[in-house]
């Protein structure tokens, strides 16, 4: 195949990601000149919608940003506004919130592992073809996902866009007897989750390495989900006990700066002037030592090293293994919360408004999610700022694409054709599990060769 002159290849949509976008790849003389992730969905203006609304409305409004991870938006919005109002939610209410968040982690990560990501490792175009060859694995993944959905339905009222979450807690909290059936289901899901780790650990992983900074929440003593402070592992740091640098969430916007680029309706983020990665690989690097013991053992057996001694995984293709370990952890954590549950004396604490600004960050399944709100004395919102994980990862995805395509072009064998490069780019993007709708939806691919 000749690659002289310009070559253009377009796909209407990238399968197995949430949303739509385009990728523009420019290659000159076997050198990648440019890789652009073009997010072209119309801006959704959620931040503008929130201005002028009451301070109790963001949990319901922001949950509509994403149908896969609505709890992340609800929890982060609640914490930011509660912080502005000087209110702390702790005890059983905080544990119930963490349980709800575990439910979302379980369902979202299981969906990505089994339906979106795993088909790539078998050369299948979708989970339907994968199920013909590995029916038991796909059914196992669906059982795990259903267990996560059951938590969200019980605590949130429904699995998609929960309606039981409010400032200060919940509209209604469950009795212990209502959580007992969840525990039985989760015990089965825990066995399934550990088996999933063993399954994905046996995949064939291409060599790859993301050498940029990693950003995740850090909550010493436990794996950060709904709490902690932002922490950074430096670029290039590996499994050598590399130090982690933290900063207060109130300083997030001093370190993470968003900028507009012509080719995307999502803002592109930089951490202290550099592209960076948030999500499962970052969480594992920053907090892996605090995984549940069963998840720790599974990580070691899966070849991820020993997170208790600071093991780091920087191969984006192996992110599927880290996500499977996180599912095992979330199931075990959910069981811990249910087993220790004592109902709170009331379903929520009052959150009276005051003129103030508050910010918060939590770990959505796809990475760190940041919210900031300002309000007037009557609770009317005067400012809303939301920085979703996929928008933060956009520059890192483009960097990763350039490196992986360049590695293939430099490799031995026949020159890579457009079809092969397209498949490689799609896999590379799916490694990061982007939720493109949250960020502003992949793949129109344009390859220019000259």
Identify what each model region corresponds to.
Residues 379:
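Active-site catalytic microenvironments in core metabolic enzymes, especially phosphate/sugar-handling
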